[in-house]
Amino acid sequence: MKKGIHPEYIPCKVTCVTSGKEIEVLSTKPEMRIDISSFCHPFYTGSDKIADTAGRVEKFKQRYNLK
């Protein structure tokens, strides 16, 4: 690698806003905040949330008096 052209990598504290967990990685920034991570994403946790679309449709129809 050429000297003097690559950024300096420093320890970076990455904080997941949703779960509040922190991990440390190497980056060019000292700190990052992310909305979702493998600690709280349904794919990784196995806790899928199934949307009750039928209930939502019925609620919508009731609200606007639709048949």
Swiss-Prot record:
It comes from the Bacteria. InterPro entries: Ribosomal_bL28/bL31-like_sf, Ribosomal_bL31, Ribosomal_bL31_A, Ribosomal_bL31_sf. Belongs to the bacterial ribosomal protein bL31 family. Type A subfamily. Binds the 23S rRNA. HAMAP family: Ribosomal_bL31_1. Part of the 50S ribosomal subunit. This is Large ribosomal subunit protein bL31. It comes from Helicobacter pylori (strain G27). The gene is rpmE.
